[in-house]
């Protein structure tokens, strides 16, 4: 007993000192871990040793990249033989250890440690940990593409929620269950997905739970609804649901996690939060950014991305995780596409470099995000008129993308490059066009269908099949107008103007290009404005309107000059060397660009890319 008493003050002092180092600005993680390791030198009781190993493992997992040391440390905490009353140490260690296994791609080990922990909880009323472990196990199965097993785990969790009388957890699990079903169906059966979400919505209407709990589930439900509609490119249809979601998250931020439903079991269950309020806020920002990108509101993309990224930076300090890094990557991806559209290549390549550096330090995210990185580099290279590099990156992304939406998006941009290349790329063009044909698409995306018809029109125009081009453009415009896909509408109108000009009808061509000019100015999209200004200059000249022709000439000249300056600025940056990176080796220095490859304006129609 004397030994224990002599250790306790040391233990408390070292833990307090470690926490001081952890919470310092910046955190002093090395010193924090050294303090915790010093506790073990006193040979404390097994429970104290296990808790200390848990604390060290948690710090290593959250703040360092030393996954192997975190794994070994947490395995000691999990394997410790502790008596009754210390179960939470084992559960938390198992929970964090499964995250380490998952990040390393060791899915069987992650499932094993979670199932072993769940076996211990099955005979106890430890509902908080049961639900946390159920959710984690379902997530691991989903990451391993075992969606049926993931659904079965969540169904088990729902039965536990019914047993303990927690309506909150029952609907929380049902939403997660539906989320996986939506992932499986969204590419094939949009109507069934809508029915599932309507059914869940009716459950929420009937359930009169605590205000905070109910509002958090409403946010979750609306997030799924908005995400589902955006996934199929319905920017107009999603608008009322997005407004509801934004109002709901505002309501949630003003609430506190107040009184629970009566009953000890229910109270224990409803302490659980799978997605904290701070994460929900970032997700709402993210879907708002996605909607703005689809609808062509580039200023809003930058505005909401900046707000969300600020919140992500705070989360990386207070609760760092791979999920927070995913939020950061997705926001950066949309910001980069916006920069490319607006003709800001220097900003774009710097932010692409941020994505590259994040993936370099987050190995668990490389598989999902590397094809996206190549896509972003392809869009950047395409906007810089580096078609060889753009083709290389798009082909890598096209072959490695697991997401059919991304693959189709890449295929559309790759097709534009091949169309511009002429006869030399007809075989490659036919192959890509066949794979992205609507009948072969694994998705019912309105935006991708409209994009496909636009690319078909561009191909027909280059082959001087003017009537076919008009036919495809009418299909593209019908879909784009119905869902407020403004960039695609502007592109289609300018190309339609070219078809009317080729048919000898300059006045009708003018009627198409003028609204496209206004629309591209609102976006704003410098490349479409440049394209439209060049066509307007020629049209006004043909129609005998010299003043308007002169205005269009000066606008074309001004945009061209600004883009040339922006491109030259981007080429001087060391990050520009990423255009030469193919994924085999890390880029260490910028590439040398021959002077003859400087920016050129295309005389032929078509935007530089379909981002």
From Swiss-Prot:
GO terms for cellular component: chromatin; nucleoplasm; nucleus; SMC loading complex. Residues 585-611 have a biased composition (Polar residues). It is found in: Nucleus, Nucleoplasm. The keyword Isomerase does not apply. The keyword Magnesium does not apply. InterPro entries: MAU2, TPR-like_helical_dom_sf. GO terms for biological process: cell division; chromosome segregation; maintenance of mitotic sister chromatid cohesion. Keywords: Cell cycle, Cell division, Chromosome partition, Mitosis, Nucleus, Repeat, TPR repeat. SUPFAM superfamilies: TPR-like. Residues 581-611 are annotated as: Disordered. TPR repeats lie at residues 11-46, 91-124, 131-164, 371-404, 490-523. Belongs to the SCC4/mau-2 family. Component of the cohesin loading complex. Required for association of the cohesin complex with chromatin during interphase. Plays a role in sister chromatid cohesion and normal progression through prometaphase. This is MAU2 chromatid cohesion factor homolog.
